Amino acid sequence: MSDVNASLVDGKKILVTGGAGFIGCAISERLAARASRYVVMDNLHPQIHANAVRPVALHEKAELVVADVTDAGAWDALLSDFQPEIIIHLAAETGTGQSLTEASRHALVNVVGTTRLTDAIVKHGIAVEHILLTSSRAVYGEGAWQKADGTIVYPGQRGRAQLEAAQWDFPGMTMLPSRADRTEPRPTSVYGATKLAQEHVLRAWSLATKTPLSILRLQNVYGPGQSLTNSYTGIVALFSRLAREKKVIPLYEDGNVTRDFVSIDDVADAIVATLAREPEALSLFDIGSGQATSILDMARIIAAHYGAPEPQVNGAFRDGDVRHAACDLSESLANLGWKPQWSLERGIGELQTWIAQELDRKN
C-alpha cells in the first residue's frame, strides 16, 4: 500500500477506464475506499479476461460498468448519471506485435476511445479536475543514442534487412535512457504510434479546455495480477509459465535486448503520487525502475526459481520491437514524491508466489 499523501483524492468522484485490468485492479486497492464514488468502465475483453466476470482483485467498493470506451451510447448512459472529478484513462490495446496485424483495433480503442471520452465530457458539461493518462515507453521507439564523439542521434526503426542479418545493435552508439523532457518521441510500432496520438489528442483538448492533464509513460510493468493467458503482453508472466512447466524459455535476437521492468506496486504507487500532487496544466513523467535489464538475465532469474533449463537464444525477431528501453527517473523522483521500491529479484519472486496461488485456486 502506498504511503504517499492522497488527500487530493479523498471524497472525490473517480472514473477509471479499463479499470478492471492489471493496473486498474491494483489502483482500486489504493483509491476506491477513499473516493465518494469509484466507477470502473471496462469491456472485459476476452484477451485479458478469460471469463467476462468481475475480477476478484477489483476492490469491492468499485462500481463496474461493463462497456466499451469506443461506444458513444455507453458514454452517454454513464455520464448522464455520473460526473467524475478525476478520470484515470487506462483503457488501451497494448500488443506491440499484434498492432501490426490489428492496427485498426489499436487505433479505434486507443485514439477513438479517447476522443469518445473527451466528446462525452463536453456533451455532459462535466468540469473534470484532473485527467491522468497512462501512456507507454513505446512512444519513444528506439529513442536517442549517443555516438563516441558525444553526438546524439535518433537511429529510428531497425529495418527488416538489418534484423535478418542479425545486426541487432547500432554500431558505435550507446542507448540513452529516455526522459520525457529531453527525448523526442519517435514510435517504431503501430501500438506506440497510437499511444502517442492518444497523448496528442488529450494534450490539445486539455490545454484548450483548461483541464489539468498528467501523462505517465510506463516502462514494462509486471507483477501479481497480470494476465497469464494473454500471449501478446507481459513476457515476465509468459516466461514464468514456461519455466514452471520446466520448458526452455526462448529468447529473441541474441538475448541482450534490454527492458526496464517495473513492479505493478511501484506503478500503482506512482499513479497515486501523481494524483496527490496539485494538478498542473500539463505534467509528463517516466515511470520505471530506472534500471535496464537484459531479457537473458531476467529469464535466468525465472528459470533458476523453478530449476528450469537454461534459456536459449533462437535468433528470432519481431518487426517494430526496440533493441533497448529504459528510462531516466530524475524528473519523476524530484517531482512526484515517489520512488520505486521493488528490485527485479524480489518482484519476480512475488509474481511466482502469486502464480502458484492462482493456479491452486483454479484447480
Swiss-Prot record:
One function term, GO molecular function aspect: isomerase activity
EC nos: 5.1.3.25
Active-site positions on this chain: 191 (proton acceptor)
Pfam families in UniProt: Epimerase
Catalytic activity, reaction form: dTDP-6-deoxy-beta-L-talose = dTDP-beta-L-rhamnose
Source organism superkingdom: Bacteria
Key word Transmembrane present: no
pH relationship of activity: Optimum pH is 7.8-8.4.
Record has Plastid as a keyword: no
Entry binding sites for NAD(+): 18-24, 68-69, 90-94, 191, 195
Necessary cofactors: NAD(+)
Coiled coil ranges: none
The protein's annotated pathway: Bacterial outer membrane biogenesis; LPS O-antigen biosynthesis
Keywords: Isomerase, Lipopolysaccharide biosynthesis, NAD
Binding-site positions, substrate: 136, 191, 220, 259
Family the UniProt entry places it in: Belongs to the NAD(P)-dependent epimerase/dehydratase family.
Free-text function comment from the UniProt entry: Catalyzes the interconvertion of dTDP-6-deoxy-L-talose and dTDP-L-rhamnose. The equilibrium is strongly toward dTDP-L-rhamnose.
Official protein name in the record: dTDP-L-rhamnose 4-epimerase
The organism of origin for this protein: Burkholderia thailandensis (strain ATCC 700388 / DSM 13276 / CCUG 48851 / CIP 106301 / E264)
Chain's gene name: wbiB
